[in-house]
Amino acid sequence: MLAMDTCKHVGQLQLAQDHSSLNPQKWHCVDCNTTESIWACLSCSHVACGRYIEEHALKHFQESSHPVALEVNEMYVFCYLCDDYVLNDNTTGDLKLLRRTLSAIKSQNYHCTTRSGRFLRSMGTGDDSYFLHDGAQSLLQSEDQLYTALWHRRRILMGKIFRTWFEQSPIGRKKQEEPFQEKIVVKREVKKRRQELEYQVKAELESMPPRKSLRLQGLAQSTIIEIVSVQVPAQTPASPAKDKVLSTSENEISQKVSDSSVKRRPIVTPGVTGLRNLGNTCYMNSVLQVLSHLLIFRQCFLKLDLNQWLAMTASEKTRSCKHPPVTDTVVYQMNECQEKDTGFVCSRQSSLSSGLSGGASKGRKMELIQPKEPTSQYISLCHELHTLFQVMWSGKWALVSPFAMLHSVWRLIPAFRGYAQQDAQEFLCELLDKIQRELETTGTSLPALIPTSQRKLIKQVLNVVNNIFHGQLLSQVTCLACDNKSNTIEPFWDLSLEFPERYQCSGKDIASQPCLVTEMLAKFTETEALEGKIYVCDQCNSKRRRFSSKPVVLTEAQKQLMICHLPQVLRLHLKRFRWSGRNNREKIGVHVGFEEILNMEPYCCRETLKSLRPECFIYDLSAVVMHHGKGFGSGHYTAYCYNSEGGFWVHCNDSKLSMCTMDEVCKAQAYILFYTQRVTENGHSKLLPPELLLGSQHPNEDADTSSNEILS
């Protein structure tokens, strides 16, 4: 890349005080919301995409005449007046300091020094980043509330406009005439029921003593109760007459409530909640949206909250001496046990606040609570998923900022710490692996402190997490010399599908050639010849003694992979990135055709075909993760998810969610495909135990109480 040594416009640059280059939450285009090729204007707070995306940064220059912009990921500086990249700095050295600060923010390492010898800690007081600041969290809290309010207002206005138009249309007039007579009948029935209720109450009141004396008697007794109750613990019981009146009025109210056809409805469709991009976190947002829309996975974590038993055991152990209390040492050991394979130990904080950027306030209306860190010293991804899903499926928020989820990921999966762009497939594998380890550790550590019901629930959820994506492959190697077949069973949690050979070389005409996911599955299960005589066949070497001096017989062989056990949720990872050169990975940008329904029967072994019914091979598309961009280390992730509550597809682009059709989904450039088995091997459509299905459809009503306890 050629660049200018000197640019007079950079030399004249005065860095704006409100520039957005150091704010990871603003590293997305304000117009199209992409996180690929993001340029921050250094003369104002504007952030937009480059000319190879939608040219929104160029349009900003044409409108504002601000010439200098910084690419926040690669840290290039570009001058639009010179139309070239520049290398020089201004007299105060702002660009050099910006680059060093950006590197510190991305890596979350603030221990490098400036020219004056001071530590570079401008973005945080501790080891965590800008998003942990109270001011930033309060600002995003207000923005989340405002976004939801505006979304609700637009929805109401659009509904009024549509109803006005529909009532004036011929179809609308016909619809209004049909139920007119039915409405009259319903009104008459309601009026009759109300009159009967009034007569009943009136008859009960007439059979009691006069209302005046009753009122005076009740007033006198209530006054005595109010005065005496301050000094005497026991309250004077009210008169039977008054109790009867109160019970009658309560019955009347409950009857009216039950008769009322008006029910509380969620503000938004449950699940249609955007996740704010906290700084190149589109990979995390797309994966979380997909997992929350998988019915089985969501119901498990709506039901399970690991922090509940931690709090309960901690309080119970202070009362009894049967077991030692859950101390900091115990919690630290559990965290250390979780991280022993990765060598990363979570640091303990002395004061921690609440769990997610979402929650409930008093009453029905929920308020987002922006925490610094999770609520417990035991950092739990399961707890953060539980809390996040509670808010996303409460039907109350159009946008939520998953601060605590990102914080927990940073602590427990250190490879994803910082604001660098990451791969969604790698994050999904690491997240599921960490969740599985956490459930196993929690279920086996300190079993005496965990209630039996909670241990049973943890075991059930662990069983679902282990089996929802788990399948088995039959690896069959055939010796070409004696035709002996050697079978090996291998587990899998996803199928990584390679593109056919014609897409493995660079060329301009490759992108125009069609490719189908069924073709990639056929390539995955096709017979592959092993190169040369490299196979040690047991049959050919059976006559050779174990300690014989004769050489081992090597033969030619062929290998084939077939599916012998189908998972309930099938993950297909399309290997779009290939190595080009020594250190470069380029993307295969060809469109892969896929259907809403997938039949896996052609890719299974014979034994599986005989043991399963035909409908067990049918899968329905549930979600699609897309990668926008050209390179492995850059780009933007979005997801298409099927919302079972609303019965429609939704495109999840960080904070922006929009309904879409199946045709739009099938046109997407898929990176990860999620298919759900229509009927399981047991003949059921769900893998969940009845205990998990009970009362966990969606937390519209429960979120007001349970979320308030968790998040406040």
Curated annotation (Swiss-Prot):
Q: Which part of the chain is the USP domain?
A: 273-678
Please state where this protein is localized: Nucleus; Cytoplasm
In the record, Phosphoserine modifications are located at 169, 239, 401
Name the UniProt key words of this record, in alphabetical order. Cell cycle, Cell division, Cytoplasm, Hydrolase, Immunity, Innate immunity, Metal-binding, Mitosis, Nucleus, Phosphoprotein, Protease, Thiol protease, Ubl conjugation, Ubl conjugation pathway, Zinc, Zinc-finger
Zinc finger residue ranges, UBP-type: 5-102
GO BP annotations, alphabetical order: antiviral innate immune response; cell division; chromosome segregation; negative regulation of mitotic metaphase/anaphase transition; negative regulation of ubiquitin protein ligase activity; nucleotide-excision repair; proteasome-mediated ubiquitin-dependent protein catabolic process; protein deubiquitination
Q: Which InterPro entries match?
A: Papain-like_cys_pep_sf, Peptidase_C19_UCH, Ub_carboxyl-term_hydrolase, USP_CS, USP_dom, Znf_RING/FYVE/PHD, Znf_UBP
Catalytic residues in the record: 282 (nucleophile), 636 (proton acceptor)
Give the EC number: 3.4.19.12
Q: Quote the record's binding site residues for Zn(2+) 3.
A: 41, 44, 60, 66
UniProt name for this protein: Ubiquitin carboxyl-terminal hydrolase 44
**Which organism encodes this protein?**
Homo sapiens (Human)
What is the primary gene name for this protein? Answer: USP44
